[in-house]
Swiss-Prot record:
This is Large ribosomal subunit protein bL25. The keyword Ribosomal protein applies. It comes from Thioalkalivibrio sulfidiphilus (strain HL-EbGR7). The keyword rRNA-binding applies. Pfam families: Ribosomal_L25p, Ribosomal_TL5_C. GO terms for cellular component: cytosolic large ribosomal subunit.
Amino acid sequence: MSVNFELQAEPRADQGKGASRRLRRAGKVPAILYGEGKDPQPITLDHNAVMLNLEHEAFYSHILSVKLGGKAEKAILRDVQRHPCKPIILHLDLLRVSEDHAIRVHVPLHFTNEESCVGVKTGGGMVSHQMVEVEVECLPKHLPEFIEVDVASLNVGDSLHLSQISLPEGVSIVALSHGPDHDLPVVSILKPRGAAAEEEAGGEAAEGGEAS
């Protein structure tokens, strides 16, 4: 189900570390809204609202509506700075987007049919994720909240690569634009631990026989 995210923002005049600390003590998060040929706009956001939004996976790969001065601007989350020890958001970077300009965003991967996968159900294999997200390029209207990766047909020893992912309309994977060497595995079905150990032991025994 699609979720709409709205951020109520206020313009921020004071900048610098001291001003940012004062904002955080007041329950605010300093942020910057930039891009699309416009001047960067320092803003503040409500810390509790930001924390709640960050709990949603879709918030990281979604077109956000930033309400500022009675107007709404579309943006994507570009960066989050967190306190290393405390549950505090230090700063957000928000990138403006327009309907006719392509954007690049990291989108989470959702793996389906893992339990019914051939290699798991009949071969006793284990699913191994090499990636949990992928960078895509698309127009804002085509941006998916996540991409499904179906592993049902994978057998033991099989891997599914980037080029084998079924993509929504208008969406491409950035890595594949750099050539076939970047068509990396996304998920693999590993051999059962016992079988892998037996193969290794068998290989060592064969080497020992040849040496003698």
